[in-house]
Amino acid sequence: MGAISFDWQRMKNIQQIHRILYTIGLGPIVGKIILLLTTTGRKSGKLWVTPLQYEEIDGAYYLGAARGLQADWVRNIQANPKVDVQVKAWHFQGIAEVVTNPGQIADFLEVRLKRHPRMIGLMMERVHHLSKRPTRAQLEELAKTEALVIIRPEAMR
């Protein structure tokens, strides 16, 4: 039920466009659903910037990882949970927590479906081969292959 035949290279190209939009000052526009996450490479020590969709819930930033624990940015966080984040024009440092509990991930997916029914419904259908309105049981099954990252801000800049 997970992402069976998704074009991850195309996703990287889209992420590059989001990076450019932030760079040229359009962060406040794309920042409604996209943030820039900076992690430290677990092997290289280099800083890596990844544009990701997010949900703000009770002052924390929630990021879904469709590739689960295989996503490089998630693996970097597992090695070093200190991250930098840019949301719109705001920059802050935070501590990231990787969550693999299917119940918590399913809760997050329900929030996303409620807030963005068309976009997330389309992703459920095209990426995960589910209906646009999956059941709780389907979300919990999908959640077994995914990960959730929760970032709690430390200091705003």
Residue map of PLM features:
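N-terminal short leaders/motifs
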Residues: 1-14, 36-43, 94-107
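Charged, low-complexity, helix/coiled-coil-prone segments
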Residues: 12-24, 47-57, 153
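Short beta-strand segments
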Residues: 32-66
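A broad, low-specificity signal marking well-ordered, structured residues that form hydrophobic/aromatic
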Residues: 35, 52, 61, 83, ...
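Short, structured beta-strand-loop surface elements
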Residues: 68-148, 154
